[in-house]
């Protein structure tokens, strides 16, 4: 499969930064920074995300989140604390397992996508395309499904094969394979 942050798999704690240290750095940057974006891996995996978002908001910062939407119940709880979300939508619902290798992952991701749109917060849906996984038919199905859901902001980005976990995909050239025009 593909992951933008393969260095975070498996999840490591050896280089963890104390939350107090993060807050101290942000205190020093008040007036210089507008927002704090929680990224990952998958930030909604972290039980401390909700209180962290609240603390950041209480400091006066806007908040952002990068997510693949795999935990809709957790996402629903934090959406009121989010100003913007970058949402990695990998495929149309019926094609999700092909991309993720995880059964029912499409149901969860698309439920989260629906929650994002219904919330009214600013968002960007994005899909990383590797031509051997997501062909033009699958990409078109994905774009249509997003449109039917009400999505208006969608970005297609080319896969950086150095982040592929699958050795065959890692050695496949995507240089001359721009995503198809929809």
Where are the predicted features?
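Canonical Radical SAM [4Fe-4S] cluster-binding loop centered on the CxxxCxxC motif
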Residues: 1-17
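Flexible, glycine- and charge-enriched loops at secondary-structure boundaries
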Residues: 12-19, 102, 106, 174-178
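Conserved AdoMet/S-adenosylmethionine-binding subsite of the radical SAM
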Residues: 21-35, 44-169
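Short, charge-patterned binding micro-sites
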Residues: 41
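Short, basic/aromatic-enriched C-terminal tail that caps enzymatic domains
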Residues: 167-182
